[in-house]
Curated annotation (Swiss-Prot):
Keywords: Cytoplasm, Protein biosynthesis. GO terms for cellular component: cytoplasm. This is Ribosome-recycling factor. HAMAP family: RRF. It is found in: Cytoplasm. One of its GO terms (biological process) is translational termination. One of its GO terms (molecular function) is ribosomal large subunit binding. Pfam families: RRF. Belongs to the RRF family. SUPFAM superfamilies: Ribosome recycling factor, RRF. The gene is frr. It comes from the Bacteria. Responsible for the release of ribosomes from messenger RNA at the termination of protein biosynthesis. May increase the efficiency of translation by recycling ribosomes from one round of translation to another.
Amino acid sequence: MIDTKQLIKAGEEKMTFAIEYLDEQLSHIRAGKANPKILDCVKVMYYGAPVPLTNVATVTVPDARTIMITPWEKKIIRDIEKGILDSELGITPENNGEVIRLGIPPLTEERRRQLVKQCKQEAENAKISVRNARRDAIEALKKSIKSDGVPEDVEKDAEAEVQKIHDKFIKKIDELYAAKEKEVMTV
């Protein structure tokens, strides 16, 4: 006898992963104000190896339009600057020899619309992942139920449970997208 709860839980875990991934991707999209997460993709050459910026410097946000980077070793300040320029963030670093300041320029209307499109694409990718997880869970349920000769009503109940979980996650994706869209479009 199969445990339908286990199969449903496995599908739910895949859906949860899709939501967490979407949340992370949306946090990397800048919304006109300083957010240190936009620097997560920056790699710095440190003793010949690329390492994340946060491994070689402290990143702080002194005000809404500035990110300040304080390297732990002063000699790598040029490497940090190069890493920021190479990451194509569209932000020019200001280096005073001690710290690097990144002035976050206000977003133009056109750039805001591009970012909203990017957010929408990320949300759509998450929805696809959730739908695939639902499909996989339902297929696993059908396969297991068919091989064990379980009554049809148990199968229908399990499918309904998977669908309910799916709908909850799709709603959550829509909420995350709407919140990010509002954040990006707010001047």
